[in-house]
Amino acid sequence: MDLIETINAVVELQHRVRNLSPNTNIYQDGQTTINDYNAIASRCNGKVYNLRDQIAQLSPFQVHMPVIPISTILSTDDHETMSAGIESLFDVLAAAIRTEGSRQNRAVVTKSIEPEVLKAVLDIGIRSQFSENPYANMLQVDTAKMEQQLEPIDDPLASQRINMLAAGGATNNTGGGYHALVGRATGKTGIITIIQGRPGAVTFNLNMKVPCSGVLSLTLLPAPGVIQLSLGNQPPNNIPVHAECVDVSTVFTEGDIVIRFELAGRVVGNANKLGTLNFPLCDRISITIEPWNANKQNNANANFNNWPAGTAQRQPTISLFVNIINASSLIDYETHSKYLAGATYLMGTTFSEDSFIASPPNVVWTMSSLLSGAPPQYIHWTRKIACMIAAFSCKI
């Protein structure tokens, strides 16, 4: 989009100006920066644009960008004038975002529609397709002008409830005869308790929001003493089982767990131990775990009497803590990353919802909601707003 590309170029120029140091000799790069600044100043200085202010009123925004004389040494006054001039330009661009963002669009747009915004874009006259915030580049991705960027993400795991109740043979009211799972997974963390009320391994899956790779940590937590099991396929008015559990992590060994990393249903890697693992590109982690077995039963406590028959008084239990330390994936509208925070902060200050004369209804005013949480009829509108704010968030 032309406004986003203009913001990108002005952000880049601001960074170059900030990299200059006053009262020192200016070399070729510094001279180029001053020339680029002067080119914009000669076109924009003194011009007035009627755009939306922070209370959504049309107000005159005047650009104050005096031309800087070319010299071998940049004075402190000239450096401060350049910095203030670019800030004046950012005031206009922020108002342009509020103005253009208030206009609804039903498809991906590449050109500003508001006449005053288009006038400002043409007067500034510089553009750059690339932003340091990958969310600002998503409209370029949508129009096939750019590939998705590979970046660290904050929420590789899909939010899911990991509940299972599988009876086998005889059962009792303390969890005997059941294979059960009770757990949750979201963001980078999953915590799952495995109750093994009869022989046999238990398998469960952790699904990724998007295919990713990174570093994974698995460790054991103290298991609860009593836990209410899910009803599984039983009628909702059934009385749930309260499993009486014994933490058997003291005898848990490498052979008791198998971790498989899957991509599109195909196993691409595996491991059979706890600890820290570098996992390959995958969209699912499948874990098979067996807290207790026949060999361990040979010297079992009396609480585990008749465990093979499913009628033990207490059940072997393990609580597994899964933590994805870091993960990288192609940035998409639904992925969360560190780049959301700064833009969302601006949505509470410079770009509050009240500063837009019209905003998408039934949408929480955060970057995540604008990018992926809007109704289908508003999604292109909300993404336009989000991408513009994301580009602006890269300014110093």
Swiss-Prot record:
An example Gene Ontology molecular-function term: host cell surface receptor binding
GO cellular component, one term: viral intermediate capsid
Broad class of the protein's primary localization: virion
Extent of the signal sequence: none
Keyword tags: Capsid protein, Intermediate capsid protein, Virion
GO BP annotation list: fusion of virus membrane with host plasma membrane
TM region positions: none
Compartments it resides in: Virion
Record's keyword annotation contains Hydrolase: no
Role description: Intermediate capsid protein that self assembles to form an icosahedral capsid with a T=13 symmetry, which consists of 230 trimers of VP6, with channels at each of its five-fold vertices. This capsid constitutes the middle concentric layer of the viral mature particle. The innermost VP2 capsid and the intermediate VP6 capsid remain intact following cell entry to protect the dsRNA from degradation and to prevent unfavorable antiviral responses in the host cell during all the replication cycle of the virus.
HAMAP family: Rota_VP6 (MF_04126)
Subunit structure: Homotrimer. Interacts with the inner capsid protein VP2. Interacts with the outer capsid glycoprotein VP7.
Family: Belongs to the rotavirus VP6 family.
Protein name according to UniProt: Intermediate capsid protein VP6
Organism the protein comes from: Rotavirus X (strain RVX/Human/China/NADRV-J19/1997/GXP[X]) (RV ADRV-N)
